[in-house]
Amino acid sequence: MARVEGQVALITGAARGQGRSHAIKLAEEGADVILVDVPNDVVDIGYPLGTADELDQTAKDVENLGRKAIVIHADVRDLESLTAEVDRAVSTLGRLDIVSANAGIASVPFLSHDIPDNTWRQMIDINLTGVWHTAKVAVPHILAGERGGSIVLTSSAAGLKGYAQISHYSAAKHGVVGLMRSLALELAPHRVRVNSLHPTQVNTPMIQNEGTYRIFSPDLENPTREDFEIASTTTNALPIPWVESVDVSNALLFLVSEDARYITGAAIPVDAGTTLK
């Protein structure tokens, strides 16, 4: 039997990258999915966000596996819209069991005292408040099912250690850990488990862009992907520059499956050993 057969999962940031990979992995294991993403570039972060066409492609990939997919165009910062759309989707599919609060952004580097106020607020609003909004919207549906459930919050290696020039990102990702631990305590009596994932660099458009290259090679005027690959490898204990989205999806599948039935409140690195350094 598939590991999440007959369950329904909510995934934010589902247009591409880790979110699409999570959707496909869970569909392969028997879940129907609710896919959330922003359909256009609502923020200026130095690289393009996922598109409506990419979100539709994720849905097609899921449906090609014989599972149902509902697409939601919503910004995780907009609680009212997110609530209405998720309520509608859960009503259609009849239940909610799994949540992957995966939506997030990266940023160009700044020294902490040079971060523009709007850049700081945007980071916290999406990478922390957006995760809380996702949980806030989803938890009542999981509790209504009285079957337990699993919530996985996407943090980062930067949620477990500090990094220079991205304090706004690191602060948001550390905040996700605190939120995860509080939710785990609150929801444990209902057999709802809450954990967080902490990847190192993941090979997606979120890192394959000029802003990230500059973070890892600050002494180079115009760093390239090859420069980034060399610099990124030095940050990991294992001799690799990054992991792939499926590596994170494999960890997520474990956490939401019965294999992890007694794991809650855990911060799980998928980091090639970067938090050891």
UniProtKB/Swiss-Prot annotation:
Substrate binds at residue 156. Belongs to the short-chain dehydrogenases/reductases (SDR) family. Induction: By limonene and carveol. Transmembrane segments: none annotated. Competitively inhibited by the product (S)- or (R)-carvone. SUPFAM superfamilies: NAD(P)-binding Rossmann-fold domains. Catalyzes the oxidation of carveol to carvone, with a strong stereoselectivity since it efficiently converts only the (6S)-stereoisomers, of which (-)-(4R,6S)-trans-carveol is the better substrate. Displays a broad substrate specificity with a preference for substituted cyclohexanols, and does not catalyze the oxidation of primary or short chain aliphatic secondary alcohols. Is also able, albeit more slowly, to oxidize limonene-1,2-diol into 1-hydroxy-2-oxolimonene. InterPro entries: NAD(P)-bd_dom_sf, Sc_DH/Rdtase_CS, SDR_fam, SDR_subfam_1. Pfam families: adh_short. CDD domains: SDR_c. In vitro, is only active in the presence of the artificial electron acceptor dichlorophenolindophenol (DCPIP). The physiological electron acceptor that is used to regenerate NAD(+) in vivo is unknown. It comes from Rhodococcus erythropolis. Homotetramer. It comes from the Bacteria. It catalyses: (1S,5R)-carveol + NAD(+) = (R)-carvone + NADH + H(+); (1S,5S)-carveol + NAD(+) = (S)-carvone + NADH + H(+). The keyword Methyltransferase does not apply. GO terms for biological process: limonene catabolic process. Optimum pH is 5.5. Shows 25% of the optimal activity at pH 4.6 and 7.0. GO terms for molecular function: oxidoreductase activity. The keyword Ribosomal protein does not apply. The active site is at residue 169. Pathway: Terpene metabolism; limonene degradation. Keywords: NAD, Oxidoreductase. NAD(+) binds at residues 10-32. This is (-)-trans-carveol dehydrogenase. Optimum temperature is 50 degrees Celsius.
